[in-house]
Curated annotation (Swiss-Prot):
UniProt protein name: Uncharacterized HTH-type transcriptional regulator YpoP
All copies of domain HTH marR-type, residue ranges: 4-139
GO terms of biological process kind: regulation of DNA-templated transcription; response to stress
Highest taxon in the source lineage: Bacteria
Keyword Transmembrane: no
DNA-binding region (UniProt annotation): 53-76
Entry keyword Nucleotide-binding: no
Keywords carried by this UniProt record: DNA-binding, Transcription, Transcription regulation
Disulfides per UniProt: none
Record organism: Bacillus subtilis (strain 168)
Amino acid sequence: MKVRTQMMYDMETLLRKVFKQIRNEINEILDKELSRNEFTILRILSEQGPKKVTEFAPILEVSASHITAVTDALVEKEWITRIRSKEDRRIIRIHITEAGEKVLQHFNEKKTEYFFKRFDCYTDAELATLIELFSKLDKKR
């Protein structure tokens, strides 16, 4: 039993360390021009379409006021627009602009390039195993 306990400890330590490294490296790529939260909002809008500002707070696990600040910055950069609902004028939805789509595409390419470099040392078989293990871990939630 001690061996398994040590394995769990080692796994937890390595997961935390590796995910922190990857997060920091991706933030380094993004932070020169946009924050991780700005990138995530653009990605969600591109994939899922217009959303109310309040829908992002639980997704990003931040306060509504933080989302307002992030969306204000995105509006200022002209990467998103705010549009009032015609049915209920109190509801404002944010939409990604063409410029926002271009920025998102640019950073998606940079992120893909990063992952190719980061995992270049692994064979296709090793990557397939890693994907299989993470998929299995994801299903355990």
